[in-house]
Structures are given as structure tokens and as C-alpha cells.
Curated annotation (Swiss-Prot):
Organism per entry: Methanocella arvoryzae (strain DSM 22066 / NBRC 105507 / MRE50)
EC number per UniProt: 2.5.1.73
Gene Ontology molecular function: any one: Sep-tRNA:Cys-tRNA synthase activity
Name assigned to this protein: O-phospho-L-seryl-tRNA:Cys-tRNA synthase 1
Classification via Gene3D superfamilies: Aspartate Aminotransferase, domain 1, Type I PLP-dependent aspartate aminotransferase-like (Major domain)
Keywords: Protein biosynthesis, Pyridoxal phosphate, Transferase
GO biological process: translation
Role according to the record: Converts O-phospho-L-seryl-tRNA(Cys) (Sep-tRNA(Cys)) to L-cysteinyl-tRNA(Cys) (Cys-tRNA(Cys)).
Residues the record lists as N6-(pyridoxal phosphate)lysine modifications: K221
Binding site for pyridoxal 5'-phosphate: A88, R89, N195, S218, G219, H220
Domain of life: Archaea
Length: 384
């Protein structure tokens, strides 16, 4: 049977991205474990997890979704209650929608991800951004949060309904003083969300220890899961609001539209969970931070400056410099991407030469050394 010509570009599509070394901050924490790859095939059908479902996703005993959501996950993220969502942005919106009314204010850091702002806009909130310090640090300080909250009070006559802290931010990998900021928010009577999309699943993280009332995490970004999938954490004080059930469909939680991640998404998260727990132990994370700092030093030795926290405390880093940009002016703007692709190194976006961000999570010192040797060889090739 001949196939419609317009359909031939669909069907199975092979990925041609080089993946011997992956430095893409969006991808390093979401690389599937071998167990998750098996789960992807076993549970890939849309409603596969619903073979023995009684009407509530989080109550499914076979597979052990109930134990994961109600026992393992709250302990792992350090919160009283947890839910699996369709991503960190969905977690943030669910919290905002449950906790606020249209026209309320939310204060969030100036390094916040765009999805935090869009989630607030979807909830019909006014957004006050906390200024970051100037280059090269781009820090978020408790004092700046206090000033922003005071400005909202003066403008609206009351404190903001919510605050949000990005921990770490997705541009520079900065880890703000979360405990000081959450304490300050609470002094003003403001509950606070910690967006841990680049923390939960990558590094040690306990929301209550940081003073969070709510947390949002990303499975496909940081928990070795197939997306879209995320996590939401809430403490007992606000659980009734965020986890409220429908008055007409009494086993369905309103903010999650009943059920969220099904099939491959939640099952790959569960399959990777033992490995994720292991890699977030302090001793494992210390090695990751050591590798990131080593790589930062090596990059600075060739003329690229690392921005943000120094010494750095996260795998995500932002670099800027002219060494590759100057070469691009003599060749073309895509030369760096092309040269790295030939060595099967992925992660720096095509066309970026003057500034770019990358992640060293899980790459290891040997492969990071290979990346540095490759970058040095590229410089010699064009400037030698």
C-alpha cells in the first residue's frame, strides 16, 4: 500500500545529534538510565499504568506509583506531600492558581525562568521581579527581596500573595541563600515557592530545610526521566488548598485536572529513581562540583570567563569571552558548533561563540578533559 507523500516525513525519525559528550544543560540531568530505557518500551503505551487503576493516578499500587508518590518522593524532596505533574512549570502554575486570586502580586527573582513569569501571568497575577546584582555575579540577595516586597506593599496596600525563588537559576547556575530569603518572606507573612528544576534530582535538596512552603521540580530536566514530567511538593499548612478535590468528582484533585503524568513519563522517573537518589548523595555531588570548578578553571585558561558564583557550586555554568567570537569573524558563526559536532560533542548552541552556557553533570573528568583538548585544538587550528 503506497503511503501519502505528505506523510513520509513522519514515522520513526532517527536523532542525528552527536552524543558522545553532552554538555546541554537542558539534557544532562534528563539522560535516561538503562532501567529507564527499558521502562520506556515496557510502559510506553499511553495509559499503560492504568491496568489496575481505581480512578486516581497517585493511588495505583501496581505498578507502585502510590509508594513512589506518597512515601519515597516526599522524603526525597523533603516536603510533607508530593505529586507528579507534567513539568515544573505546571507545578508552579498549580501552586499559584490554588494560592492566589487574579490581581494578586507575586515577587520572584530577576533570574527566574520565563515559565515562572508565564505561569504567574496565566494565573492573572502581577509580577514584581527582584533585581539581580550587576555583571559578572548576577546574584540575588535577601535585601533585594525585602525591598521588592516593601514596594509591593506600598503599591498595593498589602504584601504579595506569594514569592518564588529559582534555586539555582537556569542561566548562571547561581545558588542564592535560600534559607535567608525564605525566612525573610515568612517575616512578611508571604509563603514561598522554591523552583528547584535544576536542583531536585541533581544535588542534595530538602525543601523544608531550605524553608520552602512549596517546591517545583523537573523530571525530564533533572531526574533522568522521559518528558514531560515534574514534581510538586507542598507542606501540610497549604496542602488542603493545593490538593483540593473536586466537589463533583470526589477522587480528582482540581489543580492537576485529575491525573497527570501517565505511561512512559512517570515510569521512567520511577525506573531512574534509585540512580537519582544515589547521584544526589553529598559525596556524589561533591565530585560534580569539583568537576565543574575544574572545568571553569580550564575554560578561563583559554580566555573564557565564567560568570555567576565563584567558586561555583553547581554543574550549570555561563561563559563569555572573545576567543571563539574573534575566530568567527574570520570564518563563520557556526564554526564552533561544526568543529564540536565532528568530535561528537553536543551542548553549545549553533552560532554561539561569544557567550554560552553548559553543564558538566555526569560527564566526568576524562570527557571534560577531552572537551578542553578539543577546544584548544580548535583555537590552534584557526589562530595557529
Amino acid at each position: 500500500m503506497s503511503q501519502d507523500l505528505s506523510l513520509q516525513k513522519f514515522g520513526f525519525i532517527k536523532r542525528d545529534t552527536p552524543r558522545t559528550v553532552n554538555l546541554d544543560p537542558l539534557q544532562t540531568g534528563g539522560l535516561l538510565t538503562p532501567e529507564a530505557r527499558e521502562a520506556l518500551l515496557e510502559w510506553g503505551d499511553g495509559y499503560s499504568v492504568c491496568d489496575y487503576c481505581g480512578g486516581m493516578l497517585d493511588q495505583i499500587k501496581t505498578p507502585p506509583i502510590f509508594d513512589f508518590v506518597h512515601k519515597s518522593l516526599p522524603s526525597f524532596i523533603g516536603m510533607d506531600h508530593a505529586r507528579v505533574t507534567n513539568g515544573a512549570r505546571e507545578s508552579k502554575f498549580a501552586i499559584m492558581h490554588a494560592m492566589t486570586s487574579p490581581g494578586d502580586w507575586i515577587v520572584m527573582d530577576g533570574n527566574a525562568h520565563y515559565s515562572s513569569i508565564v505561569a504567574a501571568q496565566r494565573a492573572r497575577l502581577n509580577v514584581k521581579l527582584v533585581p539581580k546584582t550587576p555583571a559578572p555575579d548576577y546574584k540575588i540577595t535577601p535585601e533585594a527581596y525585602a525591598a521588592a516586597i516593601e514596594e509591593v506593599k506600598q503599591q498595593s496596600g498589602k504584601p504579595p500573595a506569594l514569592a518564588l525563588l529559582t534555586y539555582p537559576d537556569g542561566s548562571y547556575g547561581n545558588l542564592a541563600d535560600a534559607k535567608a530569603i525564605t525566612n525573610l518572606a515568612h517575616d512578611f507573612g508571604v509563603p514561598i515557592i522554591i523552583n528547584g528544576a535544576y536542583a531536585i534530582g541533581r544535588m542534595p535538596f530538602k525543601g523544608k530545610d531550605l524553608g520552602a512552603d512549596f517546591v517545583a521540580g523537573s523530571g525530564h530536566k533533572s531526574m533522568a526521566a522521559s518528558g514531560p514530567v515534574g514534581v510538586l511538593g507542598v507542606n501540610e499548612q497549604y496542602a488542603a488548598k493545593v490538593l483540593q478535590k473536586s466537589p463533583t468528582h470526589k477522587n480528582k484533585e482540581i489543580e492537576f485536572l485529575g491525573c497527570t503524568a501517565r505511561g512512559a513519563t512517570i515510569m521512567t522517573m520511577i525506573a531512574s529513581f534509585p540512580a537519582v537518589v544515589e547521584r544526589t548523595k553529598p559525596e556524589s555531588w561533591e565530585k560534580e562540583v569539583s568537576n565543574a570548578r575544574w572545568f571553569s578553571e580550564q575554560m578561563e585558561s583559554i580566555g573564557m570567563k565564567q560568570l555567576g558564583d565563584k567558586p561555583h557550586n553547581h554543574d550549570l555554568m555561563f561563559f563569555e569571552g572573545t576567543v571563539f567570537y574573534d575566530i568567527s569573524q574570520k570564518t563563520d558563526r557556526y564554526f564552533l558548533y561544526r568543529e564540536l559536532k565532528e568530535k561528537s560533542i553536543h551542548g553549545i548552541k549553533p552560532g554561539l561563540t561569544k557567550n554560552f552556557k553548559l553543564s558538566t553533570l555526569g560527564v566526568g573528568r576524562e570527557k571534560l578533559g577531552f572537551v578542553m583538548d578539543t577546544l584548544k585544538d580548535i583555537i590552534k587550528k584557526y589562530d595557529g
